[in-house]
Amino acid sequence: MAEETDVIVVGAGLSGLVAATEIADAGKRVIVVDQEGEQSLGGQAFWSFGGLFLVDSPEQRRLGIRDSYELALQDWIGTAGFDRDEDFWPRQWAEAYVAFAAGEKRDWLRAMGHRIFPVVGWAERGGYDAMGHGNSVPRFHVTWGTGPGIVEPFERRAREAAQSGRLTFRFRHRVDALSITNGTVDGVSGAVLAPDNVERGKSSSRNVVGEFALKAQAVIVASGGIGGNHELVRQNWPKRLGDPPKFMISGVPEHVDGRMIGITEKAGARLINRDRMWHYVEGIQNWSPIWPRHGIRILPGPSSMWFDATGTRLPAPLFPGSDTLGQLKYIMSTGYDYSWFILTQSIIKKEFALSGSEQNPDLTGKSWRMTLRRATNKGAPAPVEAFKSHGVDFIVRDKLDELVAAMNKLAGNDLLRLEHIKMQIEARDREIANPYVKDAQVMNIHNARRYIGDKLIRTASPHKILDPAHGPLIAVKLNILTRKTLGGFETDLDSRVFGEQGSVIPGLYAVGEAAGFGGGGVHGYRSLEGTFLGGCLFSGRNAGRAAAKTVG
């Protein structure tokens, strides 16, 4: 006989934890099932940089940033590019989410003990016009404690609810089907997997030791996206971005396999915008990998010169940190699936950060002493220097001819011509003498340094790339890094899932990445960053509160 509860949550990542704790706090019983072990509680969010999109925050105001709901919504709509009938609910979610980010989001988190690093980052800067893609102002608020710091309040609440008997975890329970009675989703069934104490993030076994069935008045799908499943990524790769990359690295663990998306779709849920994905172009292969094909994203400042595989500088405004999707489209149009940064030691010292909690021990460990060393150390942060020394994608040389020769050797071809690259670097270097120039990237550097946060810790003083005083020269081979699924199950503002016939499926909810972070694609085609964790928080909260009101 199936065990019964009020609500079942499929997935113990951030959105699932948020939904489950809201349900438990409302006095309802909830069971959280996940195919991974307890050590993976928090899912992808644990590995994140902990960035949150906030609007008109105290942190922004202290840095002299003037922001507003109206400006943020203008940026969001210009970035999303909503252009389909399917975008009706994503647009509603976008307006509601920006209001959340400009309203109670920060205070809600702060009441649970969440804290923010005081310097606000400026991600996805765009470079088009006021109504186009990008953040007009810095909005990327890093959680003090990075990914674990955003998971902790909800894990704590979940464990407290578990102690009181309102919440039950069922780890190593893999859902294989949703049960439906008279058109209402009322449970799940699947396989019990053998215990596996593998380290968090590493691939766990799929050995089946039993089966299970659970019944409830509502089921919330919080199972994540497809970023760990390269086959699915390639299947969904849009024609507008050219052929899918032959070589990709993974920004998420292997268990982010998209399996539950197929199971939920089979039950009649409407999946929309499946061709919209968010994959990074600044991926580097992890020299100390945790999961298969483990990649890390460089979070670059504005100064590195960016070249495609043939040695041609990327066109304006495709500079570091400007337009991820535009960069991906351009790179794939070259016929190659990689590109290059060329920079100096002075640039890497101040401008290279690595995404991920494990790559930022100072912020993750909440150590002010270690964090302050970023501004005072002679070298780059220790994890960056480790990649420079051990990473297969990094090349360090004193002379440009030696650097280019090594780049060709690493790529296994002869595409790069020294004179072509030297001409472009020297032309850029001539623009450095004045603070007013025509080179759009150099203008971008000067603009960045007008913001105190960038000037302090994220943007190097303008200098010539070929100036030996700022050497050695560094080249980084950049790979395509899989990450987020932007499409998902179509949901209303209560996270209730629509069926293929256009009506809500009773008893079924979807949250987080499985719901395109809200509505089936709250981001449209592009993200402003800091919005994925936020989408998990907002959609999970909405679903948990709505489901708690619905169940008896």
Segments the model singles out, each with a brief description of its role:
Residues 2-15:
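Beta1/beta-strand and adjacent pyrophosphate-binding region of the FAD-binding site
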Residues 25-46:
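Glycine-rich FAD pyrophosphate-binding loop
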Residues 46-76:
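N-terminal glycine-rich dinucleotide-binding loop that anchors FAD/FMN and/or NAD(P) in oxidoreductases
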Residues 65-133, 399-427:
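Rossmann-like flavin
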Residues 94-212, 230-233, 284, 425-469:
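Conserved redox-cofactor binding core of oxidoreductases
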Residues 196-287, 529, 533-542:
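Glycine-rich loop(s) and the adjacent beta-strand/alpha-helix scaffold that form part
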Residues 261-263, 267-409, 413-416, 420:
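An anion/pyrophosphate-binding glycine-rich loop and adjacent beta-alpha core
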Residues 413-518, 522, 526:
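A glycine-rich dinucleotide-binding beta-alpha-beta segment and adjacent secondary-structure elements
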